[in-house]
Swiss-Prot record:
Compartments where found: Virion membrane; Host Golgi apparatus membrane
Annotated membrane topology: Multi-pass membrane protein
Record keywords, A-Z: Glycoprotein, Host Golgi apparatus, Host membrane, Host-virus interaction, Membrane, Transmembrane, Transmembrane helix, Viral envelope protein, Viral immunoevasion, Viral matrix protein, Virion
Protein name (Swiss-Prot/TrEMBL): Membrane protein
One Pfam family of this chain: CoV_M
Positions in the Virion surface compartment: 2-19, 72-79
Chain ranges on the Intravirion side, renumbered to this chain: 41-50, 101-220
GO CC terms in record: host cell Golgi membrane; membrane; viral envelope; virion membrane
Family: Belongs to the betacoronaviruses M protein family.
Major site of localization recorded for this protein: virion
Function of the protein: Component of the viral envelope that plays a central role in virus morphogenesis and assembly via its interactions with other viral proteins.
């Protein structure tokens, strides 16, 4: 059987480069927007997209490494690709193990956030609001402005300053840290600042919250 070589003209190569250049310009623009504005204090929607993109990087990395190992350029590239594939697989499995442990402790889907393995649990209005905590610290500041609560750069929704919880928790895969309110300062109408400081830690689940039907209806 005779083999035929397919060659491309200069115009076809230039057209192909232009098409891919446009595609990559759009991809890099989207990545820039996600990285620039993907913070919970700016846009929760973009932040969720950022988490989804980060989550997809693991399987994409494994797929590329496995493909390079199956169809190698040479023996050296095959060995390196196999090592990279095994490393990516081990790191992905470790991520899932830690995320499942955190989910069993908190019951929140934020446990699978690839950016952080710390969750801040704040009991408000008869339920517990859970948000990822990017920075691990021994103290957390709560700011209530006109009845809206914000802690560690995360929005927690409507909250009466006078009914702030006396204790919040920070959950990790291997420990639950309790933080107690040590100082509170009111200013304005239903506004103020409260400081929570770590006072104990242990290997237990997040404490259950007793439902307050009246407060739950007010928040609905």
């Amino acid at each position: 059987m005779a083999s035929s070589n397919v060659t491309l003209s200069n115009d076809e190569v230039l057209r192909l480069v232009k098409d891919w250049n446009f595609t990559w310009s759009v991809v890099f623009l989207l990545i820039t927007i996600v990285l620039q504005y993907g913070y919970p204090s700016r846009s929760m929607f973009v932040y969720v997209i950022k988490m989804f993109v980060l989550w997809l990087l693991w399987p994409a990395s494994m797929a590329l490494s496995i493909f390079c190992a199956v169809y190698p350029i040479d023996l050296a590239s095959q060995i390196i690709s196999g090592i990279l594939a095994a490393t990516s697989c081990a790191m992905w499995i470790s991520y899932f193990v830690q995320s499942i442990r955190l989910f069993m402790r908190t019951g929140s889907w934020w446990s699978f956030n690839p950016e952080s393995n710390c969750l801040l649990n704040v009991p408000i209005g008869g339920t517990t609001v859970v948000r990822p905590l990017v920075e691990d610290s021994t103290s957390v500041t709560a700011v209530v402005t006109d009845g809206y609560l914000k802690m560690a750069g995360m929005h927690f929704g409507a909250c009466d300053f006078q009914r702030l919880p006396s204790e919040v928790t920070v959950a990790k895969p291997n420990v639950l840290i309790a933080l107690k309110m040590i100082k509170r300062q009111a200013y304005g109408t239903n506004s103020g600042v409260a400081i929570y400081h770590r006072y104990k830690a242990g290997n237990y689940r997040r404490p259950p919250i007793i439902q307050d039907q009246e407060l739950a209806l007010l928040r609905a």
